[in-house]
Amino acid sequence: MTSSVVSNEMYVILGASGNTGSIIANSLLSAGKKVRVVGRDSGRLQRFVDKGAEAFTADMSDAAALTKAFGGARAAYLMLPPAKSREEQERDSDAIAKAVKESGLRYAVHLSSYGAQVPENTGPLVGLHASEEKLNAISGLNALHLRAGYFMENNLAAIGMIYGMGLVGNALLPDVKLPMIATRDVGNYAAQRLLHLDFSGKQTRELLGERDLSMTEVTAVIARGIGKPDLRYQQLSYDQVEQALIDLGVPPKGAALYVEMYKAINEQVVVPLEPRSPENTTPTSFESFVQDVFVAAYRGKTSNA
């Protein structure tokens, strides 16, 4: 398919320094597009400026600044920052939606999550549900909500536990299977949809990764990758996980949200709506992720300890 997008039209990328946003920004720049990268830290945007992007510093809760950031743009990649509280999620999604409406933006690819169809009791996914609804209420906006699976990168949080305790642990049941996706696959998919702008109205697309995996299976792949064949998965209590998140610097309200999400996954409240298909399956296997990303991060941790 060839793009119908005029080459001098501007693309705006929120969260450009993050895992998905950086992939999108680099893809669009490589395709010769005009790109405006938005973030709170101008220093983290400099690598894109060096490639020809325009940097715009703004907080995601500042509707006036975001309206300026979206000014004159044809399309944007929208995402909420990591959840620190429901109140902050609401402020951010309110500001983004207001800016989209007031700027007259016509196309948006919005990072959401599988399970965002559920309106309550799913932790940070409730905020994504609300964000989808706010964007859906904007007339004239063509919005594509990407309901991505559980990020493979979330498993990087286990590195410290592997090094310190010799196990992988979180609140998920050992054998509950969930779709796991590499953020690079999300970024690549979003970039292609932005390049083509081949969607209209309000649409959702689940992205379910290469296959569904349980934490027992995840741990086995990690064990092979890092050469620790005896590594095992241990389910931790919700209270243990909540405290561990707080110890890692997650605000208490945010930690409670993530625990609520784990409960919803365990209880099969958070599940994909779409059957797995070629359209929602992405190429990066967890084995590839471990080889390409996890092992290097693990070795970096152990060498710096």
What do the PLM-derived regions correspond to, one by one?
Residues 2-47, 61-64, 71, 82-91, ...:
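Oxidoreductase cofactor-interface core, primarily capturing Rossmann-like NAD(P)-dependent enzymes
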Residues 2-5, 225, 239-305:
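A hydrophobic C-terminal alpha-helical subdomain
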Residues 52-53, 143:
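Short, conserved active-site loop motifs that form the nucleotide-linked donor/cofactor pocket
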Residues 58:
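Cofactor-binding loops of NAD(P)H-dependent oxidoreductases
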Residues 70, 74-77, 109:
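N-terminal Rossmann-like NAD(P) cofactor-binding module of classical short-chain dehydrogenase/reductase
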Residues 80-84, 264-267:
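Phosphate/nucleotide-donor binding subsite
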